[in-house]
Regions:
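Extracellular/surface recognition and adhesion modules
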Residues: 45, 57-60, 202, 229, ...
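Acidic Gly/Asp/Thr-rich repetitive segments characteristic of extracellular carbohydrate-active
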Residues: 17-41
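A structural signal for leucine-rich repeat
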Residues: 59-62, 82-91, 99, 104-106, ...
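Short, surface-exposed polybasic-and-hydrophobic patches located at secondary-structure transitions
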Residues: 56-65, 226, 354-358
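Leucine-rich solenoid repeat scaffolds
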Residues: 2, 7, 213-295
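Structural signature of tandem-repeat unit edges
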Residues: 12-22, 43-52, 65-93, 108-121, ...
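Secondary-structure capping and domain/repeat boundary segments
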Residues: 1-8, 293-358
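Consensus positions within tandem repeat domains that build extended binding/scaffold surfaces
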Residues: 125-126, 145-148, 167-170, 189-192, ...
Protein backbone atom coordinates (compact mmCIF):
# COMPACT_ATOMS: atom_id res chain seq x y z
CA UNK A 1 0.00 0.00 0.00
CA UNK A 2 1.36 3.42 -0.96
CA UNK A 3 1.05 6.58 1.13
CA UNK A 4 -0.47 9.53 -0.69
CA UNK A 5 1.41 12.72 0.04
CA UNK A 6 -0.52 15.95 0.44
CA UNK A 7 -0.25 18.59 -2.23
CA UNK A 8 2.34 21.26 -1.42
CA UNK A 9 0.67 24.30 0.09
CA UNK A 10 1.13 27.68 -1.55
CA UNK A 11 3.17 30.02 0.60
CA UNK A 12 1.07 32.93 1.83
CA UNK A 13 2.63 36.38 1.52
CA UNK A 14 -0.47 38.52 1.35
CA UNK A 15 -4.06 38.65 2.57
CA UNK A 16 -6.41 40.87 0.62
CA UNK A 17 -10.10 41.65 0.38
CA UNK A 18 -11.18 41.73 -3.24
CA UNK A 19 -14.67 42.97 -4.06
CA UNK A 20 -15.66 42.12 -0.48
CA UNK A 21 -14.09 38.64 -0.28
CA UNK A 22 -10.95 37.96 1.80
CA UNK A 23 -8.33 35.68 0.20
CA UNK A 24 -4.73 34.62 0.80
CA UNK A 25 -2.06 34.37 -1.85
CA UNK A 26 1.64 34.14 -2.52
CA UNK A 27 1.33 37.50 -4.26
CA UNK A 28 -1.32 40.06 -5.11
CA UNK A 29 -1.76 38.46 -8.52
CA UNK A 30 -2.27 35.00 -6.97
CA UNK A 31 -4.75 36.43 -4.46
CA UNK A 32 -6.80 37.93 -7.30
CA UNK A 33 -6.74 34.59 -9.11
CA UNK A 34 -7.91 32.74 -5.98
CA UNK A 35 -10.76 35.20 -5.47
CA UNK A 36 -12.35 34.03 -8.70
CA UNK A 37 -12.79 37.63 -9.81
CA UNK A 38 -11.42 38.46 -13.23
CA UNK A 39 -8.72 41.11 -13.04
CA UNK A 40 -10.78 43.48 -15.20
CA UNK A 41 -13.75 43.04 -12.83
CA UNK A 42 -11.89 44.01 -9.64
CA UNK A 43 -13.30 47.34 -8.41
CA UNK A 44 -12.40 47.25 -4.70
CA UNK A 45 -9.12 46.11 -3.16
CA UNK A 46 -7.90 46.21 0.44
CA UNK A 47 -4.55 44.68 1.35
CA UNK A 48 -4.98 43.51 4.94
CA UNK A 49 -1.70 41.88 5.96
CA UNK A 50 1.55 40.37 4.75
CA UNK A 51 4.16 41.94 2.50
CA UNK A 52 3.54 44.14 -0.50
CA UNK A 53 6.47 43.66 -2.86
CA UNK A 54 7.64 45.58 -5.90
CA UNK A 55 6.09 42.83 -8.02
CA UNK A 56 2.74 43.43 -6.30
CA UNK A 57 2.98 47.15 -7.02
CA UNK A 58 3.76 46.41 -10.66
CA UNK A 59 0.68 44.18 -10.87
CA UNK A 60 -1.52 46.83 -9.24
CA UNK A 61 -1.41 49.08 -12.29
CA UNK A 62 -2.87 46.26 -14.43
CA UNK A 63 -6.18 46.33 -12.50
CA UNK A 64 -7.88 48.58 -15.02
CA UNK A 65 -11.29 49.07 -13.37
CA UNK A 66 -10.15 49.53 -9.77
CA UNK A 67 -12.16 52.22 -7.98
CA UNK A 68 -11.17 51.87 -4.30
CA UNK A 69 -7.78 50.90 -2.85
CA UNK A 70 -6.78 50.65 0.82
CA UNK A 71 -3.51 49.65 2.45
CA UNK A 72 -2.55 50.28 6.09
CA UNK A 73 1.16 49.71 6.63
CA UNK A 74 2.05 48.67 10.19
CA UNK A 75 2.70 45.67 12.40
CA UNK A 76 0.69 43.31 10.19
CA UNK A 77 1.55 44.73 6.79
CA UNK A 78 4.88 45.72 5.30
CA UNK A 79 5.58 47.71 2.17
CA UNK A 80 8.84 46.49 0.65
CA UNK A 81 10.86 49.20 -1.03
CA UNK A 82 13.13 49.12 -4.05
CA UNK A 83 16.07 48.23 -1.80
CA UNK A 84 14.28 45.15 -0.50
CA UNK A 85 13.68 46.64 2.93
CA UNK A 86 10.40 47.69 4.61
CA UNK A 87 9.55 51.35 4.07
CA UNK A 88 6.88 53.89 4.95
CA UNK A 89 8.04 56.38 2.33
CA UNK A 90 6.52 56.89 -1.11
CA UNK A 91 8.93 58.38 -3.65
CA UNK A 92 10.43 57.53 -7.02
CA UNK A 93 13.51 56.20 -5.18
CA UNK A 94 11.82 54.08 -2.48
CA UNK A 95 8.36 52.78 -3.43
CA UNK A 96 5.86 53.96 -6.03
CA UNK A 97 2.14 53.23 -6.04
CA UNK A 98 0.86 53.47 -9.58
CA UNK A 99 -2.68 52.88 -10.79
CA UNK A 100 -4.04 51.94 -14.19
CA UNK A 101 -4.42 54.79 -16.68
CA UNK A 102 -7.77 55.67 -18.16
CA UNK A 103 -9.22 53.07 -20.50
CA UNK A 104 -9.63 53.72 -24.21
CA UNK A 105 -12.70 55.85 -24.81
CA UNK A 106 -12.88 57.08 -21.20
CA UNK A 107 -12.37 60.68 -20.15
CA UNK A 108 -10.71 59.61 -16.88
CA UNK A 109 -9.54 56.52 -15.03
CA UNK A 110 -11.80 54.58 -12.64
CA UNK A 111 -9.91 55.13 -9.35
CA UNK A 112 -11.82 57.45 -6.99
CA UNK A 113 -10.90 56.58 -3.37
CA UNK A 114 -7.46 55.92 -1.86
CA UNK A 115 -6.60 55.13 1.77
CA UNK A 116 -2.94 54.70 2.74
CA UNK A 117 -2.41 54.32 6.47
CA UNK A 118 1.06 54.04 7.97
CA UNK A 119 2.78 56.00 5.19
CA UNK A 120 4.85 58.73 6.87
CA UNK A 121 6.36 60.59 3.91
CA UNK A 122 5.24 61.25 0.35
CA UNK A 123 7.22 62.95 -2.39
CA UNK A 124 6.72 63.84 -6.03
CA UNK A 125 6.52 60.62 -8.04
CA UNK A 126 5.51 58.48 -5.06
CA UNK A 127 1.99 58.28 -6.49
CA UNK A 128 1.39 57.84 -10.21
CA UNK A 129 -1.75 57.87 -12.37
CA UNK A 130 -3.82 59.17 -9.47
CA UNK A 131 -5.33 62.16 -11.28
CA UNK A 132 -8.84 60.61 -11.29
CA UNK A 133 -8.94 60.10 -7.51
CA UNK A 134 -11.49 62.24 -5.65
CA UNK A 135 -10.72 61.26 -2.03
CA UNK A 136 -7.34 60.53 -0.46
CA UNK A 137 -6.85 59.55 3.19
CA UNK A 138 -3.22 59.53 4.36
CA UNK A 139 -3.67 60.14 8.10
CA UNK A 140 -0.12 59.24 9.17
CA UNK A 141 1.90 61.28 6.70
CA UNK A 142 4.23 63.73 8.47
CA UNK A 143 6.13 65.13 5.49
CA UNK A 144 4.52 66.14 2.19
CA UNK A 145 7.20 66.88 -0.37
CA UNK A 146 7.23 69.42 -3.17
CA UNK A 147 4.54 68.85 -5.83
CA UNK A 148 3.45 65.64 -4.08
CA UNK A 149 -0.21 66.00 -5.11
CA UNK A 150 0.26 68.35 -8.05
CA UNK A 151 -1.53 66.04 -10.50
CA UNK A 152 -4.74 65.73 -8.47
CA UNK A 153 -7.04 67.25 -11.08
CA UNK A 154 -10.14 65.51 -9.65
CA UNK A 155 -9.09 65.56 -5.99
CA UNK A 156 -11.86 66.95 -3.76
CA UNK A 157 -11.07 65.65 -0.25
CA UNK A 158 -7.59 65.21 1.24
CA UNK A 159 -6.88 63.98 4.76
CA UNK A 160 -3.37 64.78 5.99
CA UNK A 161 -4.21 64.79 9.69
CA UNK A 162 -0.63 64.31 10.92
CA UNK A 163 1.29 66.33 8.34
CA UNK A 164 3.76 68.85 9.79
CA UNK A 165 5.49 70.08 6.64
CA UNK A 166 3.80 70.88 3.34
CA UNK A 167 6.33 71.32 0.54
CA UNK A 168 6.38 73.85 -2.28
CA UNK A 169 3.56 73.44 -4.81
CA UNK A 170 2.25 70.41 -2.91
CA UNK A 171 -1.37 71.00 -4.01
CA UNK A 172 -0.67 73.24 -7.00
CA UNK A 173 -3.29 72.46 -9.66
CA UNK A 174 -5.78 70.65 -7.40
CA UNK A 175 -8.53 72.87 -8.77
CA UNK A 176 -11.41 70.80 -7.35
CA UNK A 177 -10.01 70.47 -3.81
CA UNK A 178 -12.72 71.52 -1.35
CA UNK A 179 -11.79 69.82 1.93
CA UNK A 180 -8.28 69.66 3.39
CA UNK A 181 -7.59 68.29 6.88
CA UNK A 182 -4.29 69.24 8.55
CA UNK A 183 -4.36 68.94 12.34
CA UNK A 184 -0.62 69.21 13.06
CA UNK A 185 0.86 71.32 10.27
CA UNK A 186 3.67 73.75 11.09
CA UNK A 187 4.91 74.97 7.70
CA UNK A 188 3.15 75.65 4.40
CA UNK A 189 5.56 75.87 1.47
CA UNK A 190 5.70 78.35 -1.39
CA UNK A 191 3.03 77.93 -4.05
CA UNK A 192 1.41 75.05 -2.19
CA UNK A 193 -2.13 76.43 -2.69
CA UNK A 194 -1.77 77.88 -6.19
CA UNK A 195 -4.70 76.99 -8.48
CA UNK A 196 -6.74 75.36 -5.70
CA UNK A 197 -9.72 77.21 -7.16
CA UNK A 198 -12.49 75.50 -5.16
CA UNK A 199 -10.78 75.76 -1.76
CA UNK A 200 -12.32 78.88 -0.23
CA UNK A 201 -12.44 77.61 3.37
CA UNK A 202 -9.39 76.48 5.34
CA UNK A 203 -8.66 75.72 8.99
CA UNK A 204 -5.07 75.87 10.23
CA UNK A 205 -4.32 74.27 13.61
CA UNK A 206 -2.69 75.69 16.72
CA UNK A 207 0.64 74.23 15.54
CA UNK A 208 0.99 76.51 12.49
CA UNK A 209 4.20 78.55 12.61
CA UNK A 210 5.23 79.55 9.11
CA UNK A 211 3.19 80.37 6.00
CA UNK A 212 5.34 81.06 2.96
CA UNK A 213 3.99 82.63 -0.24
CA UNK A 214 1.42 79.85 -0.67
CA UNK A 215 -0.41 81.84 -3.40
CA UNK A 216 -3.78 80.95 -1.94
CA UNK A 217 -5.53 83.64 -3.96
CA UNK A 218 -4.23 82.65 -7.39
CA UNK A 219 -6.88 80.78 -9.41
CA UNK A 220 -7.09 79.49 -12.96
CA UNK A 221 -10.77 80.36 -13.08
CA UNK A 222 -12.69 82.81 -10.90
CA UNK A 223 -11.39 84.10 -7.59
CA UNK A 224 -11.56 83.46 -3.85
CA UNK A 225 -13.21 86.69 -2.77
CA UNK A 226 -15.00 86.07 0.51
CA UNK A 227 -12.79 83.13 1.50
CA UNK A 228 -12.97 82.10 5.16
CA UNK A 229 -9.77 81.14 6.97
CA UNK A 230 -9.64 79.93 10.57
CA UNK A 231 -6.37 79.89 12.51
CA UNK A 232 -6.39 78.12 15.87
CA UNK A 233 -2.96 79.42 16.93
CA UNK A 234 -2.97 82.04 19.69
CA UNK A 235 0.52 83.10 18.58
CA UNK A 236 0.33 84.44 15.01
CA UNK A 237 2.40 82.54 12.45
CA UNK A 238 5.03 84.21 10.31
CA UNK A 239 3.37 84.97 6.98
CA UNK A 240 4.76 86.02 3.61
CA UNK A 241 3.09 89.27 2.61
CA UNK A 242 1.83 87.79 -0.69
CA UNK A 243 0.48 84.54 0.76
CA UNK A 244 -3.19 85.58 0.55
CA UNK A 245 -3.02 88.33 -2.05
CA UNK A 246 -6.16 88.52 -4.19
CA UNK A 247 -8.59 86.87 -1.78
CA UNK A 248 -10.46 90.04 -0.80
CA UNK A 249 -12.57 92.47 -2.78
CA UNK A 250 -14.37 95.62 -1.62
CA UNK A 251 -17.74 93.89 -1.62
CA UNK A 252 -16.56 90.43 -0.50
CA UNK A 253 -13.68 90.66 1.96
CA UNK A 254 -12.01 87.41 2.93
CA UNK A 255 -11.75 86.84 6.67
CA UNK A 256 -9.50 85.09 9.14
CA UNK A 257 -11.00 84.05 12.47
CA UNK A 258 -8.56 83.75 15.39
CA UNK A 259 -9.02 82.33 18.91
CA UNK A 260 -10.70 84.35 21.63
CA UNK A 261 -8.09 86.52 23.31
CA UNK A 262 -5.64 86.33 20.38
CA UNK A 263 -6.91 89.35 18.45
CA UNK A 264 -4.41 91.78 20.00
CA UNK A 265 -1.44 89.66 18.92
CA UNK A 266 -2.65 89.47 15.32
CA UNK A 267 -3.46 93.20 15.13
CA UNK A 268 -0.01 93.95 16.58
CA UNK A 269 1.56 92.26 13.55
CA UNK A 270 -0.24 94.82 11.38
CA UNK A 271 0.04 97.90 13.60
CA UNK A 272 1.89 97.58 16.92
CA UNK A 273 0.34 100.86 18.12
CA UNK A 274 -3.29 99.81 17.56
CA UNK A 275 -5.41 99.15 20.65
CA UNK A 276 -8.06 96.44 20.17
CA UNK A 277 -9.92 97.78 23.20
CA UNK A 278 -10.69 100.88 21.18
CA UNK A 279 -11.86 101.67 17.67
CA UNK A 280 -9.65 100.40 14.84
CA UNK A 281 -9.14 101.62 11.31
CA UNK A 282 -9.64 99.40 8.28
CA UNK A 283 -5.92 98.98 7.72
CA UNK A 284 -5.44 97.84 11.32
CA UNK A 285 -7.57 94.73 10.83
CA UNK A 286 -6.23 93.83 7.37
CA UNK A 287 -3.96 90.92 8.26
CA UNK A 288 -2.17 89.79 5.09
CA UNK A 289 -5.20 90.60 2.87
CA UNK A 290 -7.55 88.86 5.33
CA UNK A 291 -9.86 90.83 7.61
CA UNK A 292 -9.60 89.81 11.23
CA UNK A 293 -12.45 88.25 13.18
CA UNK A 294 -12.23 86.93 16.73
CA UNK A 295 -13.96 83.86 18.12
CA UNK A 296 -16.49 84.97 20.73
CA UNK A 297 -16.62 88.56 19.47
CA UNK A 298 -18.82 90.46 17.06
CA UNK A 299 -17.42 93.06 14.72
CA UNK A 300 -19.27 96.37 14.84
CA UNK A 301 -18.73 98.42 11.69
CA UNK A 302 -18.83 102.20 11.38
CA UNK A 303 -19.56 102.63 7.66
CA UNK A 304 -18.30 105.88 6.16
CA UNK A 305 -20.17 107.07 3.08
CA UNK A 306 -17.10 108.91 1.89
CA UNK A 307 -15.36 105.60 1.19
CA UNK A 308 -14.30 102.33 2.76
CA UNK A 309 -10.92 103.85 3.61
CA UNK A 310 -12.67 105.81 6.36
CA UNK A 311 -14.58 102.85 7.84
CA UNK A 312 -13.85 102.05 11.46
CA UNK A 313 -14.37 98.94 13.54
CA UNK A 314 -14.82 97.75 17.09
CA UNK A 315 -14.73 94.22 18.47
CA UNK A 316 -17.40 93.59 21.08
CA UNK A 317 -17.90 90.38 23.06
CA UNK A 318 -20.91 88.61 21.57
CA UNK A 319 -24.03 89.49 23.51
CA UNK A 320 -22.61 92.68 24.98
CA UNK A 321 -23.19 96.29 23.95
CA UNK A 322 -20.58 98.69 22.68
CA UNK A 323 -19.08 100.67 25.54
CA UNK A 324 -19.09 104.46 25.93
CA UNK A 325 -15.30 104.68 25.77
CA UNK A 326 -15.31 103.03 22.36
CA UNK A 327 -17.90 105.49 21.13
CA UNK A 328 -15.83 108.34 22.54
CA UNK A 329 -12.74 106.98 20.81
CA UNK A 330 -14.63 106.81 17.53
CA UNK A 331 -15.78 110.40 17.65
CA UNK A 332 -12.32 111.59 18.62
CA UNK A 333 -10.61 109.65 15.84
CA UNK A 334 -13.25 110.46 13.24
CA UNK A 335 -13.71 114.16 14.03
CA UNK A 336 -12.49 115.33 10.65
CA UNK A 337 -14.69 112.90 8.74
CA UNK A 338 -17.71 113.85 10.84
CA UNK A 339 -17.25 117.50 9.86
CA UNK A 340 -16.83 116.69 6.18
CA UNK A 341 -19.66 114.15 5.96
CA UNK A 342 -22.85 115.15 7.70
CA UNK A 343 -24.23 111.64 7.17
CA UNK A 344 -21.80 110.26 9.72
CA UNK A 345 -23.69 110.84 12.95
CA UNK A 346 -22.71 107.69 14.88
CA UNK A 347 -23.23 103.94 14.99
CA UNK A 348 -26.18 102.30 13.26
CA UNK A 349 -27.21 98.67 13.33
CA UNK A 350 -27.61 98.59 9.54
CA UNK A 351 -25.22 99.69 6.84
CA UNK A 352 -27.87 101.69 5.00
CA UNK A 353 -28.77 103.66 8.13
CA UNK A 354 -32.27 102.20 8.43
CA UNK A 355 -31.55 100.42 11.70
CA UNK A 356 -31.31 101.61 15.28
CA UNK A 357 -28.72 104.05 16.54
CA UNK A 358 -26.43 102.65 19.21
Amino acid sequence: YGIKLSEPQEEVHINATINGTAVDGASLEKAVEKSGVAVDAVTSLTINSGKVTQEDLAYLKSISRLETFEMNVGDNLQLIGMDGQPTTVLSKDTAVIEFAPKRAGSSRADMTTLTLGGITEIYNGGLKAYDSIETIHMPDVVTVGASAFGLGAWLETLDLSSAKTIGANAFNGCKRLESLTMNAVETLGEGSFKYTDALDSLTLPATIKNIEDIRFGICKNGNKSGAKITILATTPPTVDSAAFTGVSSVTRPATVTVPQGALAAYVAQVNPKADVAKVLKRQDINWNSLYLREEGSSLVEYKAKCGTWADQYAYVATGQTITADKLAALHKDDQKNLKENEELKGWNTKKDGSGDMV
